[in-house]
Amino acid sequence: WKDHGELTVDLSKPTLVIAGDEAWRVDGLEDVPTIAEPSAPAPYVPVHPAAAAIFAKADAEVGDYYVRTKPAQVIVVGHPTLHRRVMGLITDPDIEVMVLSRTEDFLSLRDGNEARGTRVKTTGEPTREWLKVCEAASSLAVQAVRDVLDDDAHGFTGLHVAAAVTDTLAVGDTVFVGPSNAIRDVALTGLPFDGVDTYSPRGAAGIDGNISQAIGVAVAAQSLRADEIRAPRTVALLGDITFLHDVGGLLRGVDQPEPENLTIVVSNDDGGGIFESLEVGQPGLRRDFEQAFGTPHGVDIAAICAGYGIAYQRVESPQELLEALTSQAESPEPVVVIEAATTRATRRALHEAIASVVGG
């Protein structure tokens, strides 16, 4: 732990906190609107990450009036990485940026041209107008995501899987989220929130060992609450590539502690779904997309689970997944894999539909 000193922050200016991995609750910033990644503490004044597209604009039209939507300053806590629009706020030359860290490392997207510290001394307080702007922007983004999820034209996607997982979490549950689309999807569908501990591997090696980590998290959670009649619930959400990358983690040692209430949800879109919404997934660039980026594998996950002696269930719709998650919560298997057979064909259209509402 390293203390880099104190920064003075005038909260009467339109201020937005962006909290990433390794973030903590910063004294003095409790009442500031916050975009928080899933592994950050749940903020008191949450702002949906898709609202970042609204904050990127200088102002927005509301009836006969224009209101300022761009923050004057952004305070970065920890190391956010998940959303391009959010990162764009940090690099915006019109926004003053302060970065807080408790380690030797700082997130630096402006060649060091940002104020750096660990603690803050605040003056003023957020204005009612700014709080209303942030609430309205966040509500618009939340509704945009929910409207997309309700549109049958997109089929059953990884975002639907994430929504089912987050919607069925309860206070006291623990959730482990894999990298790539999984962690970004749960950020769009609700996480973080109080009462649910969230773990997610990050960085270049984020895909490594996810099943093993999820098992370890489940065992640790039940060890901490060993006096409870039923082991606390742990839910892991993994993409198919992430699941296959550590499939050997399903084999546990004979003398190792066993999970008693672990649900592993595999969002299986048969390949690299995250690339569908990136530049390489554009219609004009798809000639070799499946070979180079989509990389469909056609793996039989049911057969894998049978080989390792793991309980297995397959679902093909949001409703089936909700029912499976609810059933497992009520009568848990020690370890169960729920395979959600999803599509990635509508990924780009899905994100474009959200962007069309928030202006991204």
Across the structure, where does each feature detected by a protein language model lie?
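Extended, charge-rich low-complexity interaction segments
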Residues: 64-89, 130-151, 290-303, 310
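Thiamine diphosphate
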Residues: 12, 190-360
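Flexible inter-domain linker/hinge segments
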Residues: 1-4, 149
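Terminal amphipathic helices with adjacent charged low-complexity linkers/tails
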Residues: 91-134
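Active-site diphosphate/adenylate-binding microenvironment
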Residues: 15, 137-231, 358
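Glycine-rich, anion-gripping cofactor-binding loops and their flanking helix/strand elements
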Residues: 3-9, 15-98, 102, 106-108, ...
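General structural feature for long, well-ordered alpha-helical segments within catalytic domains
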Residues: 25, 30, 82-86, 126-129, ...
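Short beta-strand segments
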Residues: 18-20, 76-78, 100-101, 178, ...
